[in-house]
Amino acid sequence: KLLTWEDVIASNYKETVANPASGDVQIWEITNKSGGWFHPVHIHLVDFKMLTRNGKPVFSYEQGPKDVTFVGENETIRAIMRFGTAGDPTTDGRYMIHCHNLPHEDHDMMTQFRVGNDVDRDPAYGPDDPQNANCNDPINADPAGASPA
């Protein structure tokens, strides 16, 4: 059966790992403690800028905008991201974070975060929706040029 957004709403699954407001800039830390596995982690809605890998500067090929990052065994990455534009309600809703290793994804290695307060808003927008123009600006966020202390 093909699952739809209505199925997600009907499941009443509302647990989230973060709840930024529209326009917030946050630094997230992702740690892989899985013991022998690597995880290409995909964060929906945003492009982000990696700040560090295991407390050290990222590799040159990791310095551009990302929506997926490789997190190897016992690694920790820090990334900065902006969640849409402040005051823009089209960004509000729930978004997925998941592993792009298909066996992991198929066995529920995923969770969600919520932007704003509209938890039931369908995040599947058309190509002309203003959200698509507003959500990819982490590079210009003030702290993006410097590593955090």
Residue ranges and their predicted role:
Residues 85-95:
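Short glycine/proline/serine/threonine-rich loop/turn segments at secondary-structure transition edges
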Residues 53, 107-109:
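Hydrophobic alpha-helical membrane-insertion segments
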Residues 35, 88-89, 105:
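Short glycine/serine/proline-enriched coil/turn segments at secondary-structure junctions
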Residues 1-85, 117, 128-149:
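Edge beta-strand plus adjacent loop/short-helix module at the start
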Residues 109-121:
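Short beta-strand elements
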Residues 31-33, 100-104:
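Beta-strand-rich extracellular modules
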Residues 26, 39, 93, 97, ...:
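Residue-level detector of short, conserved catalytic/binding motifs and their immediate flanks
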